[in-house]
UniProtKB/Swiss-Prot annotation:
It is found in: Cytoplasm. It comes from the Bacteria. It catalyses: (sulfur carrier)-H + L-cysteine = (sulfur carrier)-SH + L-alanine. InterPro entries: Aminotrans_V_dom (IPR000192), Aminotrans_V_PyrdxlP_BS (IPR020578), Cys_deSase_IscS (IPR010240), Cysteine_dSase (IPR016454), PyrdxlP-dep_Trfase (IPR015424), PyrdxlP-dep_Trfase_major (IPR015421), PyrdxlP-dep_Trfase_small (IPR015422). Pyridoxal 5'-phosphate binds at A75, T76, N155, Q183, S203, A204, H205, T243. The modification N6-(pyridoxal phosphate)lysine is found at K206. The active site is at C328 (cysteine persulfide intermediate). NCBIfam families: IscS (TIGR02006), PRK14012.1 (NF010611). Master enzyme that delivers sulfur to a number of partners involved in Fe-S cluster assembly, tRNA modification or cofactor biosynthesis. Catalyzes the removal of elemental sulfur atoms from cysteine to produce alanine. Functions as a sulfur delivery protein for Fe-S cluster synthesis onto IscU, an Fe-S scaffold assembly protein, as well as other S acceptor proteins. This is Cysteine desulfurase IscS.
Length: 404
């Protein structure tokens, strides 16, 4: 077993060796290096063929038409393109957007930008279980609502929203529905033929593909129009200009092909690993699971250890690669905005750790990690005067702290 142990699969995944092999074939002079937009010679034709094959592979994972897949640089760009693209195209129809307080920053900050441009955004509060229900969405809908954007799987707590039910609601009201599915490909079944979803964002690097490549699903029937945000040669039917990165696109295609093939057995294996891990740390007192345990992907366990500071716990767990909050915001020392939205107090939000498991996690690693967590939490609590007070029966919420 090699240390440190990687338990941060929701931040990024390593590239699957099969994906790396396919990518390496699209780089060198004797490989498939051409520009897919070169129409006049075989190098371009071969590259275009590889790109279109990958487009099919991405479409097949989510049961879409390949013509509905637009290549982007990742889920952040896909979120921007979907939300700004719809807002700008349909602004004559209305200027109201609905999203939730626990979306990824790529959605929240895009909405903030649109607010500066004169759009109005409603931010929904999730329930304590971290779920956004159709009832919450319905209560926020207005006559001038043009777009609802709700994520499929939350990146911090792994909860799975009922996008099928939300889609039925938005379609019946004539409102477009965007879903950020960066964390759900290869973990949750997605059938865009059945789902009433109009736009969906994908990322390769959360699904054992390379970083720097993603895609946006844009529905053809009923047709969804978006305004391109990147201007240039008119690639991707005018929705996203820029020379296509064949090697990355091929990597994403292969990663999604593998995901489709191996999802069922991998989910079962990862669920067994998570249950095994949780069973070994469950004996700790004052341990709280963040988010629903029933509507949740098997890869995620987000736990708060009361009376332990999350950052100090991460430092104590130097052999484990884990995180507090999402990779995109964990550099700030503010408590997780996702956990605050669930109603967790600052102390519990600060004491949370996200463990995320994946394709290369082993039982041996799980057992070692669980043992280290129990040791570190117990040791840090021994050092904590707050823990002593709690054990003596002091109600810490009633204590008045004073500066000296």
């Amino acid at each position: 077993m090699k240390l440190p142990i990687y338990l941060d699969y929701s931040a990024t995944t390593p590239v699957d060796p099969r994906v790396a092999q396919k990518m390496s074939e699209c780089l060198l002079m004797d490989g498939n290096f051409g520009n897919p937009a070169s129409r006049s010679h075989v190098f371009g034709w071969k590259a275009e063929e590889a790109v279109e094959n990958a487009r099919r592979q991405v479409a097949e994972l989510v049961n879409a038409d390949p013509r509905e897949i637009v290549w982007t640089s990742g889920a952040t760009e896909s979120d921007n393109l979907a939300i700004k693209g719809v807002a700008h195209f349909y602004s004559g129809k209305g200027k109201h957007i609905i999203t939730s307080k626990i979306e990824h920053k790529a959605v929240l900050d895009t909405c903030r930008q649109l607010e500066r441009e004169g759009f109005e955004v409603t931010y929904l509060e999730p329930g304590e279980d971290g779920l956004i229900t159709p009832a919450l969405v319905e209560a926020a809908l207005r006559d001038d609502t043009i777009l609802v954007s709700v994520m499929h799987v939350n990146n911090e707590i792994g909860t799975v929203n009922d996008i099928a039910a939300i889609g039925e609601l938005t379609r019946s009201r004539g409102v477009l529905f965007h879903v950020d599915a960066a964390q759900s490909t290869g973990k949750v079944e997605i059938d865009l033929d059945k789902l009433k979803v109009d736009l969906m964002s994908f990322s390769a690097h959360k699904t054992y593909g390379p970083k720097g490549i993603g895609a946006l699903y844009v529905r053809r029937k009923p047709r969804v129009r978006i305004e391109g945000q990147m201007h240039g040669g008119g690639h991707e039917r005018g929705m996203r200009s820029g020379t296509l990165a064949t090697h990355q696109i091929v990597g994403m295609g292969e990663a999604f092909r593998i995901a489709k093939e191996e999802m069922a057995q991998e989910n079962a294996r990862v669920l067994a690993l998570r249950d095994r891990f949780f069973a070994q740390i469950d004996g700790l007192e004052e341990l709280y699971i963040n988010g629903s345990m029933t509507s949740r992907v098997p890869h995620n366990l987000n736990v708060s250890f009361n009376y332990v500071e999350g950052e100090s716990l991460i430092m104590a767990l130097k052999d484990l690669a884990v995180s507090s909050g999402s990779a995109c915001t964990s550099a700030s020392l503010e408590p997780s905005y996702v956990l605050r939205a669930l109603g967790r107090n600052d102390e519990l939000a600060h004491s949370s750790i996200r463990f995320t498991f994946g394709r290369f996690t082993t039982e041996e690693e799980i057992d070692y990690a669980a043992k280290k967590v129990v040791e570190a939490v117990s040791k840090l609590r021994e050092l904590s005067p707050l823990w002593d007070m709690y054990k003596e029966g002091v109600d810490l919420s009633q204590v008045e702290w004073q500066a000296h």
